[in-house]
Amino acid sequence: MDIQYLMRQAKKLEKAMADAKEKLAEIAVEAESGGGLVKVAMNGKCEITRLTVDPKAIDPNDKALLEDLVTAAVNAAVEKARTAADESMSKATGGIKIPGIAG
């Protein structure tokens, strides 16, 4: 096999992966917990872009409940963001799994 051809293909893959990584910030996912009392929006880089808490979820006597709701919503958003990022990177790499690239 031609080594120059392989090098060109590797450069194309590298460029596609770099482009896909840049686009991760454009991916938007949302998750909620407590029947919508806490909502989290996140991008494909797992950065929280918005967090909303319904006033009904704020009970000074039950701080643990709010903490649990926020934790659950963030974890759900992270899972969705990772899945979306993995799908985006998979498209860029033609389905080749490259450890540590997304998520």
From Swiss-Prot:
CC terms in the record's Gene Ontology section: bacterial nucleoid; cytosol
Pfam families for the chain: YbaB_DNA_bd
Keywords, ordered alphabetically: Cytoplasm, DNA-binding
Xref: InterPro entries: YbaB-like_sf (IPR036894), YbaB/EbfC (IPR004401)
GO molecular function: DNA binding
Covalent S-S links between cysteines: none
PANTHER family from the UniProt entry: NUCLEOID-ASSOCIATED PROTEIN YBAB
Role summary: Binds to DNA and alters its conformation. May be involved in regulation of gene expression, nucleoid organization and DNA protection.
Full protein name: Nucleoid-associated protein AnaeK_3694
Organism: Anaeromyxobacter sp. (strain K)
